[in-house]
Design a protein with these regions (language model features):
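Extended acidic low-complexity intrinsically disordered regions
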Residues: 222-235
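Mg2+-dependent endonuclease catalytic cores in nucleic-acid-processing enzymes, primarily RNase H-like
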Residues: 75-192, 214-215, 232-235
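ATPase catalytic-site recognition across NTP-hydrolyzing enzymes
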Residues: 1-58, 63
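Short beta-strand scaffold segments in enzyme catalytic cores
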Residues: 65-71, 205
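Anionic group-transfer/hydrolysis microenvironments
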Residues: 61, 114, 204
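Hydrophobic/aromatic-lined pockets within catalytic cores
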Residues: 10, 25-26, 74, 208, ...
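Short acidic/glycine-rich loop or secondary-structure boundary segments that cap or lie
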Residues: 29-30, 45, 64-67, 89-92, ...
């Protein structure tokens, strides 16, 4: 190889260097997660050890349910191994969509704080309805900048490895995560348009922010609300 050519490539700005020197073409101007490297951050599915703790991270709106099953090893390395991506689901059907995919012990289901807001039409919260259906949720942190930096920490590459691996069957997360751009008015935040891109990364953010620095999980569960909801017939 031409050593002088390699040296010139190494002196290029980061994005050009990644593309030309390492063949990392998942990069573009304005990209938020410029740490992204498909070869490092994705892997073919494999059987996860039973002792790994399992979590679900979700984002929900009538326009889209995005939920990810994530296994965590003893060193807090995370493996995103299962994806739910469905639109136009009412709350009960969204809960059933998740329940139908659970065949393992789940330590916690992370969700954004607004899922604890009571709806004006029914007086019930999404979290309460999920709890009544056997899916108690854990309230994540919704500070966007803190959350996105937590994702960046998981994506950081050290000695050719990162703490986050996404199974290749999670095609929508792999498609949307590297496509996110910086917000025009706040470079520390992710642009929330186009909205179609944000649901999947938001769900991942709710997981990463709860595991930054091996932070302790605090479950938030409204038992009184859940008890009153067990007798509901119209969810």
């Amino acid at each position: 190889k031409d050593k002088s050519y390699i040296k010139r490539l190494e002196n290029l700005p980061e994005k050009e260097r990644k593309a030309l020197l390492y063949g990392s073409w998942d990069i573009f101007e304005g990209q938020y997660f410029n740490e992204w490297n498909r070869d490092i951050h994705t892997c073919s599915p494999f059987k996860l050890p039973q002792e790994y703790k399992r979590y679900i991270a979700m984002d929900y709106g009538l326009d889209m349910l995005a939920a990810y099953f994530i296994a965590v090893d003893e060193e807090e390395n995370a493996y995103v191994y299962k994806e739910i991506y469905q639109s136009n689901l009412i709350i009960s059907r969204a809960a059933n969509a998740i329940k139908g995919r659970i065949n393992e012990d789940i330590t916690a289901i992370y969700a954004p704080p607004d899922m604890w807001n009571r709806r004006q039409d029914s007086g019930k919260s999404v979290a309460g309805i999920f709890a009544a259906m056997g899916l108690p949720l854990t309230k994540s942190v919704n500070d966007r900048e803190t959350g996105w930096y937590a994702v960046k920490e998981y994506l950081q590459i050290k000695e050719g490895k990162s703490r986050l691996k996404i199974f290749t069957n999670c095609v929508n997360l792999i498609r949307t995560l590297p496509a996110l751009t910086h917000d025009d008015k706040n470079v520390n935040d992710v642009a929330n348009t186009p909205h179609e891109l944000t649901h999947r990364p938001d769900a991942l953010r709710y997981f990463c922010v709860m595991h930054r620095g091996n932070s302790r999980i605090q479950s938030v569960f409204d038992y009184n609300e859940a008890e009153s909801l067990f007798e509901m017939t119209d969810l």
